[in-house]
């Protein structure tokens, strides 16, 4: 093979290689374009059909259901013992601190003694009013009889009841004895009066017979005159006796009236005293209830289970003013809530019941899952931030039980920052890109 043949063969091989490379490059270019078109088509298909969550971003903070419980005392007083400190977990009803009880106990016992005296007096006056021989069995006295200290009080009032009733009885019996004497005198006077009336009638008949005879001188005139004198004397005695009978009857009526008046005065006195005692008793009952309430509340107790925070009382023997805040309790085992804010222009997109995804930014974002929750409250009117004057609408989100479990025991404290996303629906990526443009279309080409 000559040198020229070798050169020609090499050129042919080189041309074939260039042709093969050109075809490979064209094939790769076509494949690349097909891949680009397929990717773009797939992207368009995804952008048109794939659902994306739409919603409103929320910034908020963790709060406790019912908020922190402020511990105060209505009356105040002197601190006897402090039984908790900041950070202590307390049960509902646990004693937090105890106030000095001397003043409250003294007041309660004094009012209790007054109460015992008054209910015994009330029972005695009711017995006098009803003319009973023993104290009236009022519900208050029946209940109080069980206490040993009531025995002496009841005995004193029973003695007073008997004494007053006996005094009244003796007074009335004395008047009745006078009436009996007057009635005896009245009986005697009535007999005398009857005798005088008979004697007067006899003398009258004698005069009727003597006057005609004396006129005809059949009998001496002196006998007629003597009979007339006797008649006049008897008539005078009869009139006198009749007057005494009338006076005696009036005396009897006056004595009976005296008894009625004395009984009326006694009843009036009893009723007046009973009214005063019952009014005082009602007042003492009211004061005693207040005193017993104060005594029962010398021990300040936790209203709910939770953690003691923000202690303000540290000195045993110190003085607490009425209504002074002593500490707060953050409730535990309460629903986990988040107070958030949304811009005012987003208020029409959020309502109660919408699902929310929450992220607690205080924890590691790589290990802490998004926590599900639900919008439970949206403020009825817009609010304004006191610091910068920014308007907003407030909403409250409750973390679901599933969301609590997903935290795997992480301690959530009030005040922790939270980022949230309120899911209001779904939309495509194309809708997301073109919605702002579509929202402005009605304003396009209308400006002067």
From Swiss-Prot:
> One GO term of the cellular component aspect?
plasma membrane
Q: How does it sit in the membrane?
A: Single-pass membrane protein
Report if keyword Transmembrane helix is assigned: yes
* Location of this chain's protein in the cell: Cell inner membrane
Gene3D superfamilies with a match to the protein in the record: 2.40.50.100
Query: Primary place of residence?
Result: membrane
Q: Does the keyword Ligase apply?
A: no
Residue intervals passing through the bilayer = 31-50
Topology feature Cytoplasmic, residues: 1-30
> Which Pfam families does the UniProt entry name for this protein?
HlyD_3 (PF13437)
Q: Which residues lie on this side of the membrane: Periplasmic?
A: 51-448
Protein keywords: Cell inner membrane, Cell membrane, Membrane, Transmembrane, Transmembrane helix, Transport
**GO annotation, biological process:** protein secretion; transmembrane transport
The record's function comment reads:
Involved in the secretion of proteases A, B, C and G.
Its protein name is Proteases secretion protein PrtE
Q: Write down the species.
A: Dickeya chrysanthemi (Pectobacterium chrysanthemi)
């Amino acid at each position: 093979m000559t040198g020229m043949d070798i050169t020609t063969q090499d050129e042919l091989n080189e041309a074939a290689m260039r042709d093969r490379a050109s075809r490979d490059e064209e094939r790769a270019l076509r494949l690349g374009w097909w891949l680009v078109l397929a990717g773009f088509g797939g992207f368009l298909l995804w952008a048109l059909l794939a659902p994306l969550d739409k919603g409103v971003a929320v910034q908020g903070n963790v709060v406790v259901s019912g908020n922190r419980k402020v511990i105060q005392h209505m009356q105040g007083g002197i601190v006897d013992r402090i039984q908790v400190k900041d950070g202590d977990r307390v049960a509902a009803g646990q004693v937090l601190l105890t106030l000095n009880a001397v003043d409250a106990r003294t007041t309660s016992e004094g009012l209790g003694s007054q109460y015992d005296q008054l209910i015994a007096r009330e029972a005695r006056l009711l017995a006098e009013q009803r003319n009973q021989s023993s104290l009236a069995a009022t519900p208050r006295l029946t209940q109080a009889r069980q206490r040993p200290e009531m025995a002496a009080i009841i005995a004193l009032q029973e003695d007073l009841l008997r004494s007053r009733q006996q005094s009244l009885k003796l007074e009335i019996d004395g008047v009745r004895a006078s009436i009996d004497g007057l009635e005896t005198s009245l009986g005697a006077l009535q007999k005398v009066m009857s005798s005088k009336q008979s004697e007067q009638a006899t003398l009258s008949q004698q005069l009727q017979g003597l006057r005609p005879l004396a006129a005809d001188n059949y009998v001496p005139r002196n006998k007629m005159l003597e009979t007339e004198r006797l008649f006049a004397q008897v008539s005078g005695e009869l009139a006198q006796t009749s007057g005494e009978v009338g006076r005696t009857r009036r005396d009897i009526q006056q004595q009976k009236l005296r008894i009625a008046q004395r009984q009326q005065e006694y009843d009036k006195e009893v009723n007046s005293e009973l009214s005063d005692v019952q009014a005082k008793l009602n007042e003492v009952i009211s004061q005693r209830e207040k005193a017993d309430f104060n005594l029962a509340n010398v021990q300040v107790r936790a209203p709910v289970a939770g953690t003691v925070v923000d202690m303000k009382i540290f000195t045993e023997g110190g003085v607490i003013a009425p209504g002074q805040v002593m500490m707060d309790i953050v409730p535990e085992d309460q629903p986990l809530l988040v107070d958030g804010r949304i811009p005012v222009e987003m208020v029409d997109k959020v309502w109660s019941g919408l699902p929310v995804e929450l992220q607690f930014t205080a924890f590691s974002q790589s290990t802490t899952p998004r926590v599900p929750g639900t919008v439970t409250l949206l403020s009825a009117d817009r609010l304004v931030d006191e610091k910068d004057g920014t308007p907003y609408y407030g909403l409250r989100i409750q973390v679901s039980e599933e969301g609590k479990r997903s935290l795997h025991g992480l301690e959530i404290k009030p005040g922790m920052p939270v980022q949230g996303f309120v899911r209001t629906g779904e939309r495509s990526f194309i809708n997301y890109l073109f919605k702002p443009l579509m929202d402005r279309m009605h304003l396009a080409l209308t400006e002067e």
